[in-house]
Curated annotation (Swiss-Prot):
Gene name, Swiss-Prot/TrEMBL: rplT
Alphabetized UniProt keyword annotations: Ribonucleoprotein, Ribosomal protein, RNA-binding, rRNA-binding
Pfam families named among the record's database cross-references: Ribosomal_L20
Annotated TM spans: none
Protein name according to UniProt: Large ribosomal subunit protein bL20
Gene Ontology biological-process entries: ribosomal large subunit assembly; translation
Length: 117
């Protein structure tokens, strides 16, 4: 069997990794060995943070709802409990949006929640 030289495949693989590492600082964008490690680590961070992003946004929404609810004289937990008892099903993302951009509508929701408690 003839000897197979893998220069073409190696070159293609190196080019692919270096293309992914474009914009990285120093050797991370120029040296294959370092770039490969940087790309792998970047992928791990991206995977982890796609999941963390969901938690962080939920935390942000809850903080905004809590602040707006307290301005209207109700804590977050009592507000959410009141909404559930009043059969108002609005998710936290929309509630946070209403709290930030439409304070009057949020005040109405707080009153309904208070009434249901």
């Amino acid at each position: 069997m003839p000897r197979v030289k893998r220069g073409v495949q190696a070159r293609a693989r190196h080019k692919k990794v270096l293309k992914q590492a474009k914009g990285y600082y120093g050797a991370r964008s120029r040296v294959y060995r370092v770039a490969f490690q940087a790309v792998i680590k970047a992928g791990q961070y991206a995977y982890r943070d796609r999941r963390a992003k969901k938690r962080q946004f939920r935390q942000l929404w809850i903080a905004r709802i809590n602040a707006a609810a307290r301005q209207n004289g109700l804590s977050y937990s009592r507000f959410i409990n009141g909404l559930k008892k009043a059969s108002i099903e609005i998710d936290r993302k929309i509630l946070a949006d209403i709290a930030v951009f439409d304070k009057a509508a949020f005040a109405v929701l707080v009153e309904k929640a208070k009434g249901a408690l």
